[in-house]
Amino acid sequence: MRILFLGSPSFAVHALEALVAAGHEIVGVVTQPDRPAGRDRRLTPPPVKIAAMAHNLPVLQPETLRDPTVVETLSALQPEVGVVAAYGEILRRAVLSIPPLGYLNIHPSLLPLYRGPTPVAGAILAGETVTGVTIMLLDPSMDSGPILAQAVVDLPPTARAGQLTDELFRIGADLLVQVLPRYARGEIEPRPQDHSRATVTKMLKKEDGRIDWSLPAIVIERMTRAYDPWPGAYTFWRGQPLRIIKAAVASADGTNVPGTVIGRSGSGHPLVQTGSDALELIEVQPASRRPMSGSAWLAGVHADNIRLGE
């Protein structure tokens, strides 16, 4: 099939590679423009662009799809169908109307749950035990189009957002190449979503990762996994940020001020009082330092009466 592919980050590469391996004709790959990245702010191409160039596929990097000249360029490619995997912009009607079969989208949740930009983080924060991936048809609204197929995936209590997102897009890529030909032949009836069950996630900001020690330990522990790799769950010590990479819930009587280091675990890691129970800091990263064990950080602090968040 003649496919127009839209995607940008590393986990979107799984879908592009799967489509190429399945023998589809990729008439164009639309991805975000090169952006400055790293400490030296060097202009860096999106991972999807790198993958597309490796297969000698035509690449387009418009600043926005709202530009009428961009719409004309995409239309001239004459795709039969579009595939979207974390492109980074909601498609407007002018773009949606280009392929006769519309656009299939990979969304890493069991829609209508966790619509929006951060479904994996949302599921982890909520303490879900299962999640999944949905192949859906795009419409002008956000993640509200009819469903073609879903796969249910276990969400273990140690899952981290970055790794889980990659896994879900791998599963989604396999599901996509199974669904696409059947959909094109009319063998799959799109199923409308139950909008009454919909939940919506938000775009994350850096400050979302700042720890409020008055929250229960279980909530903060989930933050360390939901906000990995960005924005990270962090606090402050002596005015400098301290990222909490890995943590565990520990029992505590709750008589201490939240944020206070109340002792050590059996492994020597600091135990921090929270609004309910304590949080064992297993792995942390001080500002401008490499990640280290919580016990190593505590040994290097050389202070009594430690209170985090200040």
Swiss-Prot record:
Superkingdom of the source species: Bacteria
One GO BP: conversion of methionyl-tRNA to N-formyl-methionyl-tRNA
The entry's keywords: Protein biosynthesis, Transferase
Catalyzed reactions per annotation: L-methionyl-tRNA(fMet) + (6R)-10-formyltetrahydrofolate = N-formyl-L-methionyl-tRNA(fMet) + (6S)-5,6,7,8-tetrahydrofolate + H(+)
Record's keyword annotation contains Protein biosynthesis: yes
GO molecular function, one term: methionyl-tRNA formyltransferase activity
Record function comment: Attaches a formyl group to the free amino group of methionyl-tRNA(fMet). The formyl group appears to play a dual role in the initiator identity of N-formylmethionyl-tRNA by promoting its recognition by IF2 and preventing the misappropriation of this tRNA by the elongation apparatus.
PANTHER family in UniProt: METHIONYL-TRNA FORMYLTRANSFERASE, METHIONYL-TRNA FORMYLTRANSFERASE, MITOCHONDRIAL
Name of the protein in its database record: Methionyl-tRNA formyltransferase
Organism annotation: Chloroflexus aurantiacus (strain ATCC 29366 / DSM 635 / J-10-fl)
Gene (name only): fmt
